[in-house]
Each structure stands twice: as C-alpha cells, then as structure tokens.
Curated annotation (Swiss-Prot):
It is an enzyme of class 7 (translocase). The keyword Translocase applies. Keywords: ATP synthesis, ATP-binding, Hydrogen ion transport, Ion transport, Nucleotide-binding, Translocase, Transport. The gene is atpA. SUPFAM superfamilies: C-terminal domain of alpha and beta subunits of F1 ATP synthase, N-terminal domain of alpha and beta subunits of F1 ATP synthase, P-loop containing nucleoside triphosphate hydrolases. It comes from Thermoanaerobacter pseudethanolicus (strain ATCC 33223 / 39E) (Clostridium thermohydrosulfuricum). ATP binds at G232, P233, F234, G235, S236, G237, K238, T239. This is V-type ATP synthase alpha chain. GO terms for biological process: proton motive force-driven plasma membrane ATP synthesis. One of its GO terms (cellular component) is proton-transporting ATP synthase complex. Produces ATP from ADP in the presence of a proton gradient across the membrane. The V-type alpha chain is a catalytic subunit.
Amino acid sequence: MSQGIITKVSGPLVVAEGLPEAKMFDVVKVGNQGLIGEIIEIRGERVSIQVYEETSGLGPGDPVVSTGEPLSVELGPGMLEGIFDGIQRPLDVIEKKVGSFITRGIDVPSLNREKKWKFTPKVKSGDKVSGGDIIGTVQETVIVEHRIMVPPAISGIVEDIREGEYTVTEPIARIKTDSGQIVEITMMQKWPVRKARPYKEKLPPEIPMPTGQRVIDTLFPVTKGGTACIPGPFGSGKTVVQHQLAKWADAEIVVYIGCGERGNEMTDVLLEFPELKDPKTEEPLMKRTVLIANTSNMPVAAREASIYTGITIAEYFRDMGYSVALMADSTSRWAEALREMSGRLEEMPGEEGYPAYLARRLAEFYERAGRVICLGSDNREGALTVVGAVSPPGGDLSEPVTQATLRVVKVFWALDSELAYARHFPAINWLTSYSLYSDVVEDYMNKNVSSDWGELRSEAMRLLQEEASLQEIVRLVGIDALSTRDRLVLEVARSIREDFLHQNAFHEVDTYSSMEKQYRMLKLIMIFYQEAQKALEKGVPFSEIEKHPVREKIARAKYVEESKLTVFDEIEKEIKKAMQGLIEGGAADA
C-alpha cells in the first residue's frame, strides 16, 4: 500500500501527491479517519480523488493510502432482503453499530461474515468446471435459490467439494486449474463495479415482461432484457410507477436503487414490501429484493457509485439464470453528481454544465441490460431489465439527461403533469410515449393470449389519437357541432382513458391486472364501440347509448378479481343484448 499526502480539498474532490503506483479507479483511504474515495483523474504526480463521505475537517498534509484495488462489490448469499448504501455498506449493521446517522470512516463488511449458510454441491470431485458453472446452491430466502458459480476467469478439475454449513469466506471447494495451481472457491466473489460481468451471447429481447400496469403492458410494453425510461416533472408519479414495477413486474429478483431521492421514499419501500405478497409465491416481496439507498442527504459523490453498485449486483443474479429488474430512481441525480465532480475537476462543460461524456456514461449503464446466455456449460438464460427514472427540471424533456437517455433506451413512458393534476394515474401520456418493442410483444401476445390482441391495441390507439384531434374542434366550436359518430368516438375514448388506462395503485384488486384481464377489459370497450356503431346506423339516438346502465358495468370491470374473469363473458352478452334492445325499441317506436 503506497501512501501520499493531500495537497488540496474542494468539497468531495481531494487532490493528493506521492502515489506513484496509483491507477485509475483505485480505492483510497483519505485522512486519519480513512474515508473511502476513488481515483478519477491522474495528471503526472497529482491524483484527483472523489471521496464518498463528508470531507469537512480534511486539509493539506493529511495522509492518503491507496489500496491498489478498484471499487468492488461483494457478491454472495446475504444480499437479498438487505439495504445498502451507495458503496454497498449494510445500513442495518451500521445502525446497530453507531445509531441512526452514519459516522465518517466507518468500515463494515458488505456481507455477514459470521452467518453460516447450508451449501449443497451440484458437482462432485473429478468433474471439469469452467467460469460460470454452478457448483452448488444455497437456499437464501424461501423463494430464491442462490446459485454458487465458479468465478469467470477460473476453469479446471474439482479436487474437493463438500456439503455443509459455511460462512461466505470459508472455502467450499478446491479447483485444480489447467496450469496445475490449486484455487480455493468461497461462496463470495468480488467484482469491480465499473466492469460489466461477462456472458456468452446476447439474445434479442423478445419475451414481454408483464408489469400488471395496463397502460404499460397494453400500449407501451417492455421486454425481459429491455431498457425503459420514465421522465416527468415533480409530482407526476415517477416514484409510484417505479414502486409498482418493483412490486408487480414479472421478475424473479428486483434491485431498487434510490439515487439522490427523498429518504421517505425508501422508507415507503421498506415498510410496504415486507407486507406485500408476491402473486406467484404468496411470500413477502422483500424476499426477492435488494435495496440500495443513497438518499439526497448523503454525500453527492456516492450517487455515482450507487448506480454501478446496483447494476453489478443485478448482473450477478442475471448470471445465475434469473430474470432481474433494476429500478434506478433517479438517473438525473446521478448526472448531477457527474456535473458537480466535472466542475470541480475544471473540465470543459457541455450543455447546461453537464460533462461532455454524459451521453457515453448513460449509454454504458443502459448497455449492461439485456437477455443473455450466461457463462457456464448449461447455457442457461438470464435477463436484466433496466428502468431509469429521469427528473428534468420543470418537466423540460429537451434537457441533456432526458435527450441522452432517449437515444439509448427503447421504451419512453412520458409522465404528464396535466394528467397528474387531473388525478389520472399512472400519468403516462399515450400521445407522446412510445415502445420500440411493441411489434415483438404483439406477435407474442397474438400467439399466447389471443389472436386479436394486436388489432384491439391498434384500434384503441387510433381512438385515443382521434379523440385528441376532435377535442381541438370541441374547444373551438363546442360538442354540438360534432356528428353522432364523432361523439361516440369521444365517449369510447373517454371510456378507454377512465375505465382502462386509469389505475389505482392503492386498491387491492386494481393495483395489478394480468394480461388475460387486460385483454378482456379492452375487448369489452371495443365490443361496446362496435355494437354502439351498429345501433347508431339503425337510428338509435346517441343520448340513449350514452346513458345506458351497461356502461357502468364496463367501468366497474377493473375491480373484477383475477379468479372471476368469467364475469367478462356475461358483461359481453349484456352489452350485445342492451344494444340489440335499443335497436328493437327504436324500430318498434318507428
């Protein structure tokens, strides 16, 4: 370990000299308290260090010690149900040690060193293994089996492997490599956060990831291994959408990063998730979740690390063959941390003061998502889906972080303050949002749910767009100037908005809709539209169609439980019968 001295302190940036062997992104201990920092620039003898803790009290002449290792995370049993800070320090352990506020220079291991885990081998002595092969399993929580893998760079013959209870640092197996060297394998691996974990092959993201949110799954779907962003102004519901995705997305593991957001939002997650049951296993959602809390009152520099820490943990679970969903809330705070460090380094600023390399850093982050064939001889598939929230100041979507994000992600869920103020949630604007996965998902849904899924979706989108243009006319000349056909379009589009797209995140039934239920709900509205068109053609007055009591049954369909979807068949019959009754009644009057 080489030791240098501080020459300058500027907020979270410390400049030091006397570290000749230092490398980029090495971790250093700064000052007498040993604050954790990372080298982000080397110029001759001088190194610039971003410190992940409060730097008040540091001054020129204080010592700096280089560890010679990059910032890494510990990967192994004990991460699930855990809550960590941006550099993977367990907050519950710190709280027991020093109380509610994190003191500076505290050094605690990320994974519990005392707890013993029951290890069950999957290979035997004499078997040949290579990087990524699963050599055994640990039942980490009731619903997640933690698969212990050979580190990527190691291959050889298993010399010795034993079943039993071990801590994460005790050897569970010995492998004789091709060069004759004996390597001891533990349940814990260390991995540098800025380096993507390797895989065999990247696959096209073709399988949809149901989220239970109707506006997302039907109109703007995301796939397993896809990328999505949620930009929106303050108060438009970004965090609630992220929480909904974390709760109900069809993923086996969820990694939730609270990056520079309010602390009470992480508290909500900590209080809600243990109470909520996973619909597939009926176990608490917390048992498949890893939380990284880097709230707005924590040091700014650690925000940058938190995003990398989270995605490295997510990649590790992906390598086991799991489908993983990563929520980053919010990437704007991360970009602001980049901007602050760039300013302190006196780099040339780009647009709005952000560094010129902002787009590259964002692309590198989203590039780590994907559906892959993992390393290992069993060719297992894993997927990592990334959903990033963006908080543009004043909801201005033309600002650099939103624009750089839109260049790399395939799904854009635009949150609208007007919809939010009108209490329409989720406030995803159906006219400006898009999904580049919709064609792939449409093929999948046509095969697996119903052959007319694609037609229903296209018709619903057409009606919503037609409604927007008709509303312009209504504002100018009033609704009475419209033909009855146009008034029906407005009425059906309103039904799509209020009875289908609007969803209550806090209602026990409406919070989640299966793909089957979403299809049945949309089909009801479209059957009403078709039957009402026939009634209009036969001369039935529009006012009678509009006021018919069957409309209320369509509106209440969202509260039908998943186990009672046969109710939709009855409502379909009622709609047809009601419209037929209006036609026959009109004919009798004539």
